[in-house]
Every structure is written in structure tokens, then in C-alpha cells.
Amino acid sequence: MRKLLFALLLASPILTFAQGSQVNTQGIRALGMSGAGSALFVDETSIFYNPGALVKSANNAISVGASAVMFRSAFQEVNSNVQHDTKFQISPPFSIFASFGPKDSWWKAGIGVYTPFGGSVDWGTEWPGKFELNHLALRAIYIQPTLSFKLTENFGIGGGFVYNVGSVDLSRSLPVFDQNGNPGRAELSGIGTGMGYNLGVHYHLEDEFAISLSYRSHVRTKLEDGDAEFTVPEALGSSFPTTKFSAELPLPSSFNVGLSFPLNDRLDLAGDATFIGYSIYKELVFDYEQNTPVLSDTKQTKKYENALSGKVGLNYHASDKLDLRAGAGYVYTPVRSQYVYAETPDNNRLMGSIGFTYILSDKFDLSGAYTFQRVMERTTTNAETRLSGTYKTNIHAPGISLTYKW
């Protein structure tokens, strides 16, 4: 009973960048190429993609961007013809990047505020997995001051300190019922913090090619004094007291290699390969401040595996004012079949993107992009909850950014 009631799924947020919970919409230019471009694009978004490239940017700049991530998933239980769909929701990850330093100097500094992890999903209270999850909303905001140095005209290095502020809000039904047959409800919310770093090296050989190597450390987000509230029949109130809880969510590290080559005077080809260290996420432990015979501290097995992603994209210089982009990618899931949960009904996925940048003036650029991700259909039986069925998931994510340069 305890295991059924309180294997609460704080776990991974919705995943829209590489799996698990990453949202790769920090740079709208790169988004238009499915996340490729860490070697090609040298601008203020390099704070995120590769701090070593930041020093090579020609201008100081401030860039503000936002996306509308629309996650739609459907579930059909084994031996049933009824399909249950998530409610339509929009998650708005955002990014703000600013770079500054002397023109043509050997150094440049910057700061980024962005949301690499986050999302929301709402299954409602009537689907077969209501005792697993009703809804989840999670966001991790990274604040990253960065320094970048030019060792030679072609070789740059850089690094940034990352401070994370994360929030979570989730609910699920409880298998205790009132006199009208309505199930109970558990609601958890809280804020956590963590720290990490981002390192990068960027090398280019005139107009022939560029290579990018970058590493983002894992961040252990510690959530303390979260609020746990329970709606149950009055007779069970003492077994489900309103209380506090703590938990720790390890957000994964990643190592990225990017390459770019000019195919001709107008067309560039870029590719990125990313290794993501999800194996750090082995279990999720909840420590409740107040325990009862029913409400005890719990441990939920995750056993995530490391994952890989590959992206390739084209950037076409259509005119002096307009660049057009397209890209595609394939991503391997870190989630093992027996540990698929409703908050991450994940599998390997295909993605495709288009995008543009239009130069409004000497000072302003406008970029836009749209990416679609098709998560492969997955039929699974959860090892702990025994929920068995097939998940189908699509993700749409348009985005826009405005850059001011000086």
C-alpha cells in the first residue's frame, strides 16, 4: 500500500531536447537546425552551447528568446480500445543572454539565464494511470556567468559557473475513496537549488571548418521543505497529515562535439553529437518530515541509462538580410522499458526543424524556428505500478528571439 501510494513521481521533467527533461530551445538559430550548430554559430548563445566560442563573437549583444513547447501524449491500456489523451498545455521555456567586452579583445564576458530542463503534462483524473500521475509541472532555471578567452586568433576557451533554481508542482490520485467513490489526492510542490559548470573549446580554420567541444556538468538539485498536502476522507486524515518533504534530483551532464563546413559561398553544413550522462539518475528518494504507518519515506527505482543524440543541419545565406535553416536529428532514450512512467512516456525519437534569421537593422536581428519531435510508440508494463499499455507522443516547439547588438 505504501509503495502504491507514495512512489510519487517527482522524477524527470518533460524531455524535449535530448531525453529525460532537457529543453534545447536556448538558441533559436540552433533550434532551426534541430540543435546542431555549436561549431557554426558564434554569438551570445555560445554562453550555453560553447563558452569557448563567445570570445570570437564580433559584437556585444543582448538576446531574448522564448518558445512554446506543446507536448501531446496518448495512452491506450492493454486489452482496451479507449485512448486517453493529455490535456493541451503550453510550456514556455525562455532564455536571456548578454555578452560584453572590448572589441577584438582577447577576452569576453557574458551571462545567461535559461531553462534547459522543464515542462508540464496533465493526464487528468480519469485515466487508468491516475494513481501514478495526474499532472506535473517542472522548471529548472540556470543562471550562468561566463568568461571566454582567445588563446590564438583561431582558438578559444571558456567556462561558466551554473546556479540552478528549480520548481516542481505535481499531483496524483490516491486509492482511498470517500462515500461517493471519489479517490483521494496528493499534491506536492517545492523549490530546489543546485550548482554546476559549463566548459568549452572552439577552433576554426579560416573559412574551411570549425570544431566545438563542450562539457556541461551534472547538477544535483536539492529540494528541501517542499509542501505535501493530501485530500482524503476525514477518517484517514491522521494517516495523511500535511507535511514537508525533501528530495534530490540529479540533472545529467553532457559532452558535445560539433563540426561545421561551408559547402559553398551561401551554404553551411553543421553536425552535433551529444553524450548525456543520465546513468547518474538511479533512484528517487522522498524524505517526509512527518511519518505515519502509511506515509513513510520512499525510494523509487529509476536506473536511467546514458543516452546519445545526433543532429545535422543546413544554414543557407539567402541574402544580405536573410538566413534560412533546416535540420534533423535522432535521439536515444535513457528510460528503460520497465521504468517508463507517465511523466516521461519516453522512447527514441526523430526530430525535424526549420528556421530563419532576418536582419532588421544594424542593431537588431530577429530569429524564428519550429521543431517537431516524434517519439516512437512504446508498449510497456511498469515494474512497480504494473500499469500496462501503449504510449504515443508528439512534441511541437515554435520559438522566436530578438537580438540587440552594439
Which role does the model predict for each range below?
Residues 38-60, 99-104, 151:
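Outer-membrane beta-barrel pore proteins
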Residues 4-13:
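Sec-dependent N-terminal signal peptides
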Residues 19-31, 76-83, 91-406:
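Outer-membrane beta-barrel porins/channels
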Residues 23-37, 55-72:
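Transmembrane beta-strand segments of Gram-negative outer membrane beta-barrel proteins
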Residues 4, 39-42, 143, 352:
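Short hydrophobic "helix-edge" motifs at membrane interfaces and signal-peptide entry regions
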Residues 14-18:
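Sec/Tat signal peptide C-region and signal peptidase I cleavage site
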Residues 35-42, 71-90:
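Surface-exposed strand-loop-strand hairpins of Gram-negative outer-membrane beta-barrel proteins
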